[in-house]
Amino acid sequence: MEQLDQQQAETLSAIAQAATPEAVEAIRVSALGKQGWVSALLKSLGGMTPEQRQSEGPKIHAAREAVTTALAERKSALEGAALEARLAAETVDLSLPAPDLAKGSVHPVSQVMDELAEIFADMGFAVASGPEIEDDWHNFTALNMPETHPARAMHDTFYFPDKDAEGRSMLLRTHTSPVQIRSMLKAGAPLRIIAPGRVYRSDSDATHTPMFHQIEGLVIDKGIHLGHLKWTLETFLKAFFERDDIVLRLRPSYFPFTEPSVEVDVGYTLVNGKRVVGGSGDADNGGWMEVLGSGMVNRKVIEFGGLDPDEWQGFAFGTGVDRLAMLKYGMDDLRAFFDGDARWLGHYGFGALDVPTLSGGVGVRS
């Protein structure tokens, strides 16, 4: 078996010197292929006597194992070296500045909607929604606005030529108050909801658009009075503007769906010529501005909601989401909200991770 030892030594030497995977494969074929010398020796075992097989068999199998192992190790080494060379040639310079990628932003109105929902959820309010195409009963009649009420005029309301199955006129809702009626009819009392959403009125200037966003709140329970309303609004505005020095002023007003009705002013301070919400409006450098309409729910509205006004009382409030966004984040023209200007959105928009939380701050930016 001197020839076996010599062939094995020559093969192992050739494997060690192989410089390419192709050379390794050629050696494998010459040794382990069908016509290879190792294969020939394995075939010769069949013609040997039992004593010869017992003597030579282990040597032949050992040679095959040695060659197989050497081939695998050399192939792996060559592949590793090739990979390292390729990686070295493709090295990325991480110090180079990355190109700016276009990214979207959360619209201020959407962000403020989330802020309001977070605040009122902490106060026990549920979010309710309703159709934007309403009938005049839910939009006007059930809210104590009869057919002769001026709010029904064509110049204030977008009407459709269609009527519903009951012959009621269809329109784009002028406020989210119909959601209050639908919620009372569906859920009954006690009730504590906010109703954010889009509303429509025929008006357009720097502070008004034909479509805008509104949020209204409704609380129905036993023993509700105006003090509950004031506490709710103070708590809400302090959380929203993230200031403890919020001062409210309630002025008598008129809304057909509340009695008594009050308009809510918030005190502000002039800082570098700009209004900053907070502090008393009676201060030398301060003033008052209206932010909310509210009042105790009219008895007729409670009746239209299917409840007994002698048993249940409530308060309601409403404000423009767009106006709140303008006050909090310093935007001047409401029409810019809907222009789709990417530069404006890039400046005033919020990141996807700017999720409002009471613990982290409802107006936080990442």
UniProtKB/Swiss-Prot annotation:
EC class name: ligase
Entry keyword set: Aminoacyl-tRNA synthetase, ATP-binding, Cytoplasm, Ligase, Magnesium, Metal-binding, Nucleotide-binding, Protein biosynthesis
Any Pfam family the entry gives: tRNA-synt_2d
Gene designation: pheS
Subcellular location field: Cytoplasm
Assigned GO CC terms: cytoplasm
Residues of the signal peptide: none
Documented EC number(s): 6.1.1.20
Protein name per Swiss-Prot or TrEMBL: Phenylalanine--tRNA ligase alpha subunit
A molecular-function term among this protein's GO annotations: tRNA binding
Cofactor note: Binds 2 magnesium ions per tetramer.
Catalysed reactions listed for this entry: tRNA(Phe) + L-phenylalanine + ATP = L-phenylalanyl-tRNA(Phe) + AMP + diphosphate + H(+)
GO biological process: phenylalanyl-tRNA aminoacylation
Domain of life: Bacteria
Assembly mode: Tetramer of two alpha and two beta subunits.
Similarity-based family: Belongs to the class-II aminoacyl-tRNA synthetase family. Phe-tRNA synthetase alpha subunit type 1 subfamily.
Cofactor requirements of the protein: Mg(2+)
Protein residues bound to Mg(2+): E259
Main subcellular localisation: cytoplasm
